[in-house]
């Protein structure tokens, strides 16, 4: 075993069915007196139901969270925080709401508690993202990490199947790309494998029965593992492409990850043999990109970037943006090969495994 150093970063985690009821105790443990509750417009009523036990301790609600964390939304949320004299944040929802909470925690230096309702995994990472002027900026800062995360699988039972599947594939992407990170060590490798295995197993069960509480529990556990791995590992081509597609074209986050992942792995895995072997073991297939493609197809997830709003003329722009900055990746970034990847993903073709 090689030598390694692990600076382990993690929120306090409360996991299991019904754990949303622990919110009053967990908020008290944080010493929070007046939390501002964040949600998307669609989840405002769910958020109100969850925080009802803490009553008038809630300073107020901000239900404007939206994907890719636009600067104007951040500004509105900061005004809401200051206008309500809040001292902390409760974020309830998916990656968009968590992403907004992370920026507020960083900008205002306040603690947050997150209750995820999807499998995005953002709540476990120090990664933040902001979109301004059609460009998405990302970075890392320990300040954005929530103090506490409550994982209650019962809150995901009503998550629509299409969102469940793409969100789960998004989580798989975090760990799959982590397996060829230069920062990988045996601890994080185990987390990646556990997370991917749990999600690979859960997705077909969710398709068969979306209300399967055990499958929901396994998927949420997998998302936790994959998100934690991402926190400690570098990102490569897949995440760069998805951030570019999302921030520049405003494509939906989870769907973009689900579509791009098989193609990004087809590009990289021939240059990352150890990661390829691990993924072959988990997927039960020598052709991992096709196994992921089939998993998405059989679950009814979108397969092409055209389906979610990309236009043919966007391909050269995205290619050039992805090539603009250097970042670690197993395979050198080549303009023609990258364009082929994007064309295949745009058209929804089976990934090229050559």
From Swiss-Prot:
GO biological process: 3-chlorocatechol catabolic process
Disulfide pairings: none
Keyword annotations of the record: Aromatic hydrocarbons catabolism, NAD, Oxidoreductase, Plasmid
CDD domains: MAR (cd08177)
Origin superkingdom: Bacteria
Pfam (any one): Fe-ADH
Pathway(s) the chain acts in: Aromatic compound metabolism; 3-chlorocatechol degradation
Reactions that this protein is recorded to catalyse: 3-oxoadipate + NAD(+) = maleylacetate + NADH + H(+); 3-oxoadipate + NADP(+) = maleylacetate + NADPH + H(+)
Sequence intervals crossing the membrane: none
GO molecular function: alcohol dehydrogenase (NAD+) activity; maleylacetate reductase activity; metal ion binding
Record EC number: 1.3.1.32
Family: Belongs to the iron-containing alcohol dehydrogenase family.
Subunit structure: Homodimer.
Record-given protein name: Maleylacetate reductase 1
Source species: Cupriavidus pinatubonensis (strain JMP 134 / LMG 1197)
Lineage: Bacteria, Pseudomonadati, Pseudomonadota, Betaproteobacteria, Burkholderiales
Encoding gene (name): tfdFI
